[in-house]
Amino acid sequence: MKNFTELRVQIDEIDQKLISLLQERSRIVQGVKTIKDSTHNQHFQLYIKPDREYSILKKIINTVGNYGYPKEFFYRTWRGIISASNLLEQDLKLLATCSKSYNDIYQHFGMQSLPVIEENSHKAFEMLQTNIFHILAFQTNNSKIFELLKNNKEVKIFAIIKTQERQNYTFLCGKISLETFSSPAVVVTTQETNKILNKEASIFLSEDFEINDNTLGCFYPAVI
């Protein structure tokens, strides 16, 4: 039977291997960045691929099983790795409309980039449109942002951050292509469905995946 010292040495060795693997992963991400930089035009667009992120997280959760660390730990760990990779690929500036959405986007991106709060929804959206900031976090009860999204073809919702502590969730939006979204993604739409999200702004959710002129964005459901 091994003693504490031997076991701790093993743990330290595993930690070093994990660090080396993460450093290697970051170098690969830099290679991905180079390719994306060469293929994107001059008009800013987020490199983030929600479909790829959903696929990675789902595969991780399905792989780990029920032994050892809980699935929530693996989800948070890989969510942090993915977000760190997002920031390696692009120098992203984060914006939030309130303290709640600030905390959510700060946690979502692994506390690696400090967001800025702009409570004026029109000003916040304008700074997103003009690329002063690149991702905007807002609460699902913010009807002003929904109204601005209705008249915009570039800025789209691409993620939702859910918390157990409150009813209103946080949406993330930015200049992103919706082409990569597919089922089981959920559509945020102005077309009336049986799942209303914001009555004041006439915004709905649709699980019948279809991107059309009424689509304000899409997001994937949680994998755990």
What is each residue range found by the language model?
Residues 1-224:
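Domain-level signature for soluble enzymes in the chorismate/prephenate branch of the shikimate pathway
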